[in-house]
Amino acid sequence: MPGLFAPLTINKMVVENRVVRSATLDGMAQNGMVSEAEIALYGELGKGRIGLIISHGLAPTREGQASPGQLSAFSDDAIPSLKKMVDAVHEGGGKIAAQILHGGWMCRPEVTGLQPVGPSALLHPRSGQAIRELSGDEIVQLVEDYAQASRRIREAGFDGVQLHAAHSWLLSAFLSPVTNRRGDEWGGSAAKRANFLRRTCISMRRKLGPDFPIMVKLGIRDYHPEGKPSLEGVETARMLEADGVDAIEVSEGLEADFFHHIRKDATAPYYLDECRQVRQAISIPVFLVGGIRRLDDMEMVLSEGIADAISMCRSFIMEPHLVERLRSRLTESSKCTSCNGCLGLMSKGRLACAIV
């Protein structure tokens, strides 16, 4: 099996190694546009010899903004701003894909000025906020909104695009029977619950052409007692491959607890079993994310064929040049302790390690 520092091909894109910087909201955008702080952040990541950098989630619609500091991709006006981020990474020798993230039922009215939307009308379990059910026509429009956002991403010069379909955001909520209680073509069976995501991927492929890498961060199973099992998530991954998706980043879907996917006490990578199942089911590249800190764990995951690449985020918040330190054996592990202090700083419009 190829090692951590072997090249990886995703569609026509070749990245120099199998380390991925996974996306996270950074809270630093200014009115949806790239800030100077973000240019500096991504410029430093671009110098770090990371195989592929995935940006924080770009909102495909104004109503889908998940945080006040989120980047936008719902207007052509955003293209020159996004290009500054891309240029900063490319000047350092890196490659960058843009993630698209619609907050859906996780959005807050104080950010969007609107009632949050989702697959079904219900109350949000934490905030108590009433969620408005999207109509069929609105879903069709959202498919086009995602495709237009991906077109802007390509025009800004990004090397690829990733859809966020995990962590309870809009696409993830459609995949879960807990939040999707519809009885039409967009809900019910597992296949129908996947229709929104699949049609979005197909629409994006038509917009982007055959050679532009399309990736999906996919919640393979829900960490909720009434949620979807991993078997459904694996089948969704199969369908996405058939629809022209080029890579899957394995994560979790609906969360009973927001901090479930950022666990301080984990002693091993979180999603090994789910990733192994997906890797056995599809032929496109699979990324494993979640709690990976040690070089020997990374090498084990690759050597055993569990995944094709290793995704990390908090480690790069603390050490943007971690890849070079691992390559030269100056360290055997990230220094990150998963204290999650970076989350507190993010809420204040700054993405940084709280203990460095």
Regions found by a protein language model. Name each.
Residues 1-356:
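Flavin-dependent oxidoreductase catalytic cores
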